[in-house]
């Protein structure tokens, strides 16, 4: 049995007179006596359902006006163009079904008119996700991954899926989650790095993975998460310049895709998305230290890692996405390839966000073995 023919965002005033079926949540009900308005919310927005007593009949009207907020409802009705309605149309219902009545009082207010504590949100997470701003974030995340997968596919990069239960660390053993694996100790994987390198040796040439990573580290900062979705890329027969070109095109393409396809979600979040210009700037580590000293008075020794304040300053000064290149070999992983004529400098780089004070991507050419 079909319970929905359209989402609210698919309906317009041009469909005047057309019968539709909507399904979603009772977001709000305004009772004005002989007429009432039910605002139905689905994942694409909201639709105004106009309840007229003389058209619905006494019993149906009484039932409809008593629907509790956040109940799951199905509405069959006809579209009517109405300039005063929020989206330029209203639905005159011929049938209303309550598929699941919400218990009252609600644990939180999905209309966001009443704020609530984080603990309350997490205790009733399914209700919290109903909030338009939270749902918009999920939809934008989906759009970003869709754009990246499409770009990688066009570049001939193969998507792979590597094990998430491993016997040993891939990047040091201090930040692994241990688990029991059939009476043996195993760990949740913190990176697919070793598997990607194995696939390079197997001749797959270009691979990527989008999947979860797990790190047992302090998580009370914006730089650390115990669980996250990681986008990992590995390319053979290429140098650092080739990889930077792939990354900047992929990132700028994702921005552009979201700007074009997630306008409603961005509006819900009150965000204006600026698509970064190509190519991204290349700033050497040495030049970054000079900028920090010239304009912020920061004094750092060559070979020091950049701290949060320096990265924040650089982002504000440069004002756009940029690559931080030519790092000291001593502060990059051992497998990072150094320049032959300057072994103290390596061919590793970070893709930096101008306002988040952190790297979007950390990459390098691998040492030849």
Regions found by a protein language model. Give the residues of each.
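Class II aminoacyl-tRNA synthetase-like tRNA-binding/catalytic domains
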Residues: 2-236
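Short amphipathic alpha-helical segments with heptad-repeat character
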Residues: 138-142, 146, 237, 241, ...
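Acidic/polar loop patches that form or flank catalytic/metal-binding clefts of enzymes
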Residues: 160, 259-263, 299-302
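Cytochrome P450 heme-thiolate monooxygenase catalytic core
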Residues: 161, 266-268, 324
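A translation/RNA-centric and nucleic-acid-associated enzymatic feature enriched
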Residues: 175-242, 246-253, 278-366
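Flexible helix-coil linker/hinge segments at domain or subdomain boundaries
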Residues: 253-267
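Short, highly charged C-terminal tails/helix-capping segments
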Residues: 265-278
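Cysteine-cluster motifs in flexible loop/terminal segments that predominantly coordinate metals
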Residues: 369
């Amino acid at each position: 049995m079909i319970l929905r023919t359209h989402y609210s965002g698919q309906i317009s005033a041009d469909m005047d007179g057309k019968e539709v079926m909507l399904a979603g949540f009772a977001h709000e009900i305004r009772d004005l006596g002989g007429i009432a308005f039910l605002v139905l919310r689905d994942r694409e927005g909201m639709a105004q359902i106009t309840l007229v007593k003389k058209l619905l009949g006494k019993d149906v009207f009484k039932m409809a006006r008593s629907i509790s907020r956040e109940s799951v409802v199905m509405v069959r009705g006809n579209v009517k163009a109405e300039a005063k309605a929020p989206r330029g149309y209203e639905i005159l219902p011929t049938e209303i079904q309550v598929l699941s009545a919400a218990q009252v009082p609600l644990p939180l207010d999905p209309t966001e008119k009443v704020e609530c504590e984080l603990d309350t949100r997490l205790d009733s997470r399914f209700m919290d996700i109903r909030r338009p701003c939270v749902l918009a974030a999920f939809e934008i995340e989906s759009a970003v991954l869709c754009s990246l997968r499409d770009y990688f596919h066009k570049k001939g990069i193969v998507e792979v899926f590597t094990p998430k239960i491993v016997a040993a660390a891939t990047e040091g053993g201090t930040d692994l989650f241990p688990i029991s694996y059939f009476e043996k100790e195993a760990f949740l994987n913190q990176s697919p790095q070793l598997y990607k390198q194995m696939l390079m040796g197997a001749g797959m040439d270009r691979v990527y993975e989008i999947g979860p990573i797990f790190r047992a580290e302090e998580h009370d900062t914006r730089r650390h998460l115990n669980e996250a979705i990681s986008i990992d890329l590995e390319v053979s027969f290429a140098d650092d310049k080739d990889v930077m070109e792939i990354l900047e095109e992929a990132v700028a393409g994702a921005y552009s895709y979201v700007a074009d396809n997630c306008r409603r979600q961005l509006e819900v979040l009150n965000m204006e998305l600026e698509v970064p210009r190509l190519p991204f700037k290349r700033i050497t580590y040495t030049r970054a230290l000079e900028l920090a000293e010239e304009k912020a008075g920061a004094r750092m020794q060559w070979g020091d890692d950049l701290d949060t304040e320096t990265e924040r300053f650089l982002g504000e000064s440069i004002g756009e996405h940029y690559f931080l290149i030519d790092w000291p070999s001593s502060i990059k992983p051992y497998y990072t390839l150094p320049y032959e004529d300057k072994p103290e400098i390596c061919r590793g780089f970070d893709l930096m966000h101008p306002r988040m004070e952190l790297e979007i991507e950390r990459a390098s050419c691998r040492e030849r073995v």
